Amino acid sequence: MSLSEYLREFAEIFEEAAQELTSIFELPPDLLKDITEEDVGTDDSCNKKFLEVQKQKEDEEDEEILKGVDLTQQDSVREKIHEIQSMSQLSEKRKALLMQKMLMSGYLKYRRTHKKESDENQLSSSDLEKTYYDKEQEILGCSHYMRNCKVQCFDCHEWYTCRHCHNDACDHVLERPAVENMLCMICSKVQPAAQYCKYCKNCMGRYYCNKCKLWDDDPNKSSYHCDDCGICRIGRGLGDDYFHCKTCGLCLPISVFNTHRCIERSTDCNCPICGEYMFNSRERVIFLSCSHPLHQRCHEEYIRTNYRCPTCYKTIINVNSLFRILDMEIERQPMPYPYNTWISTIRCNDCNSRCDTKYHFLGHKCNSCHSYNTCISSIYKPLDHPQVSIPRLATAEDAGMRRLMGHSWDNSDEDFNIFGIHSFI
């Protein structure tokens, strides 16, 4: 007999007994109603207790059946599954629940242990240990921020001074908007995230953003939150020294409000040099004259050996002096026969024009803008007649420039309209 059938039969017997008692003693209707309601409540309580006892009994039986299985050994697990399947006294539903409980026993044990530790709010010695931005001057924080608190990751519940410290140590990313708790490093008290500690009343950071859960106690840094970007950035604020460009999808200096060229979601990509995602990077991002972004640190290293944008190959620094040297070198070193009869069809990376020019090992000059930043499309050889197509000749057009990269040049950023932005803080 199933449990539901048993309870149904029990209720019918109880109802018959109540009718007999009513007919014998002829109780008043209102009194009978009160007694019936009280009996129903008692019956529900008994049923609940009965179910709890029944579940406890089943759990004990399950533990006895699953005793001895080693989840790390496939043979042991397979043997136990066959044993459960062969138990004719168990229903198919009970067998399925048993196998599920066996396979999830390790996870359930971890959850119970983790929940217990979380409920007791136990903090390890490493959690309570203070971290410093500058240990000599006793400025609390980490290598990334000045702050007086630690944050708890919503996913792993571990404590770190900032999201960067967490991301460097863990295999997942800390989502700052999801942070709920902070640990004051002054009084070592856990509490909801806020700018001030509710126990010692100390300020956790001069700047605090409740949306990003960002604390920064650096007195020399100004920060603001941009709702369109969805993050905090370095600066005095929108309308003061920055504006948000809807097309580019980021905040730009007000000085380039009327001059910058819009590229949709321009920083929603990785840096072409180091590969780091630029939209929320802490590194300063600059925009080249062609409006392509990259990290300022990467740009400074890159232009030591290259003069072209890594994305579109346009010239990004002033190399006019090198072009003049190339003019003199090409004039001084004429090509020998039969190379002096060859004609190159070139495409200019700076002005995108196509033209024909004399072939030379050192480089090919654009007839429109006089730039040597060109690439060969094809070469016409009068002695052979057929025109040999070269989809991409990676060395010929740069041979002369590589020889001259050791020379100095005027790399003034003003001539090439390079400007920078402070990104995610």
From Swiss-Prot:
Residue positions binding Zn(2+) 6: 245, 248, 260, 262
ZnF locations on chain (CHY-type): 135-202
Stretches annotated zinc finger (RING-type): 271-313
Matching Pfam families: zf-CHY, zf-RING_2, zinc_ribbon_6
Zinc finger motifs (CTCHY-type), residue ranges: 204-270
GO MF entries: ubiquitin protein ligase activity; zinc ion binding
List of residues binding Zn(2+) 2: 153, 156, 166, 172
GO biological process, one term: proteasome-mediated ubiquitin-dependent protein catabolic process
Binding positions for Zn(2+) 5 per the UniProt entry: 226, 229, 244, 251
Record: residues binding Zn(2+) 3: 184, 187, 197, 200
Binding site for Zn(2+) 4: 209, 212, 225, 232
Binding site for Zn(2+) 1: 142, 144, 162, 165
CDD domains in the record: RING-H2_Pirh2-like
Keywords for this protein: Metal-binding, Zinc, Zinc-finger
One CC-aspect GO term: nucleus
Protein's name in the database: Uncharacterized RING finger protein C2F3.16
Species in which this protein is naturally found: Schizosaccharomyces pombe (strain 972 / ATCC 24843)
